[in-house]
Regions:
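N-terminal interaction/assembly modules
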Residues: 1-53, 73-74, 79-80, 85, ...
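Short amphipathic alpha helix immediately N-terminal
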Residues: 53-70
Length: 101
């Protein structure tokens, strides 16, 4: 048969034990970040700055990962990043995210 290109399944929120932030906070950060494009300009700037601080030279990959439903594998391939590098950036981002943005 012909090869079918696997359609990216939208990501779902999953609690990550590796991130020392509560389930509720992780959910808040996850969904707030996904709503990036609907947030006020000032909040968008805060999120972008958090990505720059946490992702450093890989901030564009981190930004794409937290503000879209692109999967980790796709983001890593696109930005030539190892999964562990992205994981560390995501952990820093979650740890630095303010209580209320």
């Amino acid at each position: 048969g012909g090869k079918h290109k696997r359609k990216e399944v939208p990501r779902v929120f999953r609690y990550k034990k590796s991130i020392p932030v509560s389930y509720e906070r992780q959910g808040y950060i996850y969904f707030t970040s996904l709503l990036y494009w609907e947030l006020p300009k000032r909040t968008q700037e805060k999120i972008l700055n958090l990505c720059i601080a946490a992702g450093k030279e890989n901030y564009q990959a981190l930004f794409e990962f937290v503000t879209t439903d692109a999967g980790a594998q796709a983001v890593c391939l696109r930005h030539h990043l190892s999964p562990s590098t992205l994981e560390r950036a995501v952990r820093r981002y979650y740890e630095a995210f303010p209580r209320k943005i």
